[in-house]
A protein has these predicted regions:
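Oxyanion-binding/catalytic loops of NTP- or PPi-dependent enzymes
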Residues: 1-72, 79-85, 103-207
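Adenine-nucleotide phosphate-binding core of ATP-dependent small-molecule kinases
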Residues: 80-100
Length: 207
């Protein structure tokens, strides 16, 4: 029987989780035994592509190593390498392909996936994320906002009553979102959202 997973396709790191027998979300580690996978792609040749920590080792040393492409999702952007030019969607497909492969080696066949995106992602960026996942061989059940996913998880884990409006901040490696949310009967109502697609931890690191 196939499994349902959740994917955080992040700007700097990505992760996969699934519900265990008790209904608790647990991280599925990658082939390297890591809980998170660096969202970095290296084109070593026309046939050889590295993803994750192996690619990150060469970050900044060559134009063939690409990171933070999530920030350009939905835009007409191409990253030039010695082995071709690649869109953010194509690069995301490569990362998602590794996540799928590594996860299936541990839990078996994946039936469907829920993929999170920044709350301020444009419709084009959401569509590109959906296409990237599908091209990686994933059946996408839902695309949901990252603050919404965080609120659902916190509500379930803490047992707190979140029926009154709460503020959820999502400061990631490359994006910053804020959402005003209510949770009632496991249903999330998003009252309002805003954010910056070009502000995150990576920018603080450069300062």
């Amino acid at each position: 029987m196939g499994k349902i997973i959740g994917i955080d396709l992040g700007t700097t790191f990505s992760a996969v989780a699934q519900l265990d027998d008790t209904g608790r979300a647990v991280i599925v580690h990658n082939q390297e035994g890591e809980n998170i996978t660096a969202s970095v792609v290296e084109f070593a040749s026309n046939e050889l592509i590295y993803v994750g920590s192996d690619a990150k080792k060469s970050l900044g040393l060559s134009k063939n190593v690409i990171a933070q492409f999530k920030r350009e999702m939905g835009e007409d952007k191409k990253y030039e390498t010695d082995y071709g030019n690649y869109s953010p969607k194509h690069l995301s497909t490569i990362v998602l392909g590794k996540l799928k492969k590594d996860t299936e080696e541990i839990i078996g066949e994946i039936d469907s996936a829920v993929v999170t995106v920044p709350a301020n992602f444009s419709n084009n960026a959401r569509e590109e994320t959906m296409k990237a996942a599908e091209e990686a061989g994933l059946n996408v059940a839902y695309i949901i906002n990252e603050p919404t996913a965080a609120a659902l998880f916190y509500s379930k884990e803490s047992g707190e009553d979140l029926s009154e409006p709460i503020c959820v901040y999502d400061l990631g490696g490359g994006t910053f979102d804020i959402s005003i949310i209510q949770v009632k009967d496991n249903e999330v109502e998003v009252i309002g959202s805003d954010g910056l697609q070009l502000l995150g931890g990576a920018d603080f690191d450069r300062k």
